[in-house]
From Swiss-Prot:
UniProt name for this protein: Cytochrome c oxidase subunit 8, mitochondrial
Propeptide: 75-78
GO BP annotations listed: mitochondrial electron transport, cytochrome c to oxygen; proton transmembrane transport
Taxonomic source organism: Saccharomyces cerevisiae (strain ATCC 204508 / S288c)
Similarity annotation: Belongs to the cytochrome c oxidase VIIc family.
Gene Ontology terms for molecular function: oxidoreductase activity
Residue intervals on the Mitochondrial intermembrane side: 74
Subunit structure: Component of the cytochrome c oxidase (complex IV, CIV), a multisubunit enzyme composed of 12 subunits. The complex is composed of a catalytic core of 3 subunits COX1, COX2 and COX3, encoded in the mitochondrial DNA, and 9 supernumerary subunits COX4, COX5A (or COX5B), COX6, COX7, COX8, COX9, COX12, COX13 and COX26, which are encoded in the nuclear genome.
Presequence boundaries: 1-27
Pfam families: COX7C (PF02935)
Length: 78
């Protein structure tokens, strides 16, 4: 008896889910196209993007070497 009741309630719930719209319409539209799907500006910049890109990674790469130099300088190795 309990099993049949559970089957009925499950069938009712699944039929309710199937009647809902699957795709929701959004009122916001973003521009599509080349360079529009990234959160920063690539074309039409004052400085080339490559300069900021490689500069960022160069600073990150240099930090451990600068830290080692400072620590060795403090210890009197240089």
């Amino acid at each position: 008896m309990l099993c049949q009741q559970m089957i009925r309630t499950t069938a009712k719930r699944s039929s309710n889910i199937m009647t809902r719209p699957i795709i929701m319409k959004r009122s916001v539209h973003f521009k599509d196209g080349v360079y529009e799907n990234i959160p920063f500006k690539v074309k039409g910049r004052k400085t080339p993007y490559a300069l900021s890109h490689f500069g960022f990674f160069a600073i990150g790469f240099a930090v451990p070497f600068v830290a080692c130099y400072v620590q060795l300088k403090k210890s009197g190795a240089f």
